[in-house]
């Protein structure tokens, strides 16, 4: 199964890459807000992926970013983000990827993330580890928050909702780490945690298709995933991916901030 999904992701990614090189601004649209963007390519890529998966695995549910839900109560459900990092895609940046995850009864069992610009194919299956271009992945060995680079998103400051502005958490964490990065693709951020490049990545607002593949890639590489309270109520209560070793330390920082600002 995973070989088919990998080839589907590669095919979709190469198609998207060819479209990026000739992207017409008239093919860019807004979704819920003026800065929540989608392109004709996002939609075409999702249709390509769904078509391939439905032919090979009929009856499986589909949860895609662009065309919504289909048969999601089935035992197996695909979670698809056709271009994770659309803003980067539009502006010619490399930080975007194809993300395809498979859940069985709500539990991730397979994940594939393909970055066509960087030519990196990340993948994982339950119990088989995480891999990139044939090399086994492992999270970073660092034991302290002060030794790692972290990533997050601050898209909240571009939208209408401001109740839970991630900048306040970033300002709490940033002085305590080596450095901060913002890549703009949840799938690639997860893969960076799995690869040992990042010690942690968190978000306040994600959809299941954003991390549908990345969650398993992180955990199979030895990482840990939880909400911002250390429980499994994600993404409703935020979501964080770490190398496991620093998980409790960074959660304590979130807790301390909330305790100070009640």
Task: List the model feature ranges, each with a label.
Residues 70-72, 105, 123, 141-144, ...:
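Solvent-exposed alpha-helices and their adjacent loops that cap or buttress functional pockets
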Residues 34, 118, 233-236:
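Short acidic/glycine-enriched loop/turn segments that link adjacent beta-strands
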